[in-house]
């Protein structure tokens, strides 16, 4: 297999640096580009400087140049940035791995439509563990569909800008689908004041922000006399980076299509 030429968007950020480190360590991948936001003080620096390495790849804000030199773009940025990168990827036939969260439904529709022209994987969480957890939740939701209240509690670092997290929403969507509903029909986001008794048909969400928490997610099935908790905790972003590389390898066998990590891992 030839080496995958991979570019990283948001290259100077926490996740971007982890992705660069993972690409440099992968025997089947080459760092082909490092994209950063316009105005970033890191522009022009070597992408491996934070590791004390010289990669020969400088941080740039030129998406056209990056896409001209890469075959894959891994993007964990923000929705507006990802959509701009998507346009360039379509022009240059670059395959996309998208871990960005916070998309609106119309924006998600744009990503799905792009799958008709290029190959892309979109997932709110690239971790293998989280995606196996989704299968556990699908099974549990069917068993606890009656007589159990469902709550999703997530915690992230103080810098996270969207809530609930994309992973929490993905968990809610999985549970809702397993019980024949849509999340829009049953989600309750936070509670305040006199809320009245809990509607047993709802799925509740609570979000915690603080410190350097990488990502904790717990789904609580609360019945009478017992509680079942399914929890996933991320100790570092390494699992996200390794999952993103796994997604890129999966895309090597596809010219077009819209996929998620369930497809990548063969969990469907």
From Swiss-Prot:
Keywords: Amino-acid biosynthesis, Cytoplasm, Diaminopimelate biosynthesis, Lysine biosynthesis, NAD, NADP, Oxidoreductase. (S)-2,3,4,5-tetrahydrodipicolinate binds at residues 157, 166-167. Pathway: Amino-acid biosynthesis; L-lysine biosynthesis via DAP pathway; (S)-tetrahydrodipicolinate from L-aspartate: step 4/4. It is found in: Cytoplasm. GO terms for biological process: diaminopimelate biosynthetic process; lysine biosynthetic process via diaminopimelate. Gene3D superfamilies: Dihydrodipicolinate Reductase, domain 2 (3.30.360.10), NAD(P)-binding Rossmann-like Domain (3.40.50.720). NADP(+) binds at residue 37. Coiled coil: none annotated. Belongs to the DapB family. This is 4-hydroxy-tetrahydrodipicolinate reductase. The gene is dapB.
């Amino acid at each position: 297999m030839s080496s995958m030429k991979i570019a990283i968007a948001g290259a100077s950020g926490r996740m971007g640096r982890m992705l660069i480190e993972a690409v440099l360590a992968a025997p089947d991948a080459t760092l082909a580009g490092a994209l950063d936001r316009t105005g970033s003080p890191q522009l022009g620096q070597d992408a491996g400087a934070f590791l004390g390495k010289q990669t020969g790849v400088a941080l740039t804000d030129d998406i056209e140049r990056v896409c001209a030199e890469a075959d894959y773009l891994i993007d964990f940025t923000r929705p507006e940035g990802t959509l701009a990168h998507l346009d360039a990827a379509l022009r240059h036939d670059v395959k996309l791995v998208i871990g960005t969260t916070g998309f609106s439904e119309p924006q998600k529709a744009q990503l799905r439509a792009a799958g008709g022209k290029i190959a892309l994987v979109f997932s709110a969480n690239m971790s293998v563990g989280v995606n196996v957890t989704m299968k556990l939740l699908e099974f549990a939701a069917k068993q606890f569909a009656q007589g159990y209240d469902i709550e999703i509690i997530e915690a992230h670092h103080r810098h996270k800008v969207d809530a609930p997290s994309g992973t929490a929403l993905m968990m809610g969507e999985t549970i809702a689908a397993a019980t024949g509903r849509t999340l829009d029909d049953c989600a309750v986001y936070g509670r305040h004041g006199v809320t009245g008794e809990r509607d047993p048909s709802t799925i509740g969400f609570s979000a915690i922000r603080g410190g350097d928490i990488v990502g904790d997610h717990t789904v609580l099935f609360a019945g009478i006399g017992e509680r079942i908790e399914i929890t996933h905790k991320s100790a570092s972003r390494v699992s996200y980076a390794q999952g993103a590389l796994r997604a890129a390898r999966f895309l090597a066998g596809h010219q077009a299509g819209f996929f998620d990590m369930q497809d990548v891992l063969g969990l469907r």
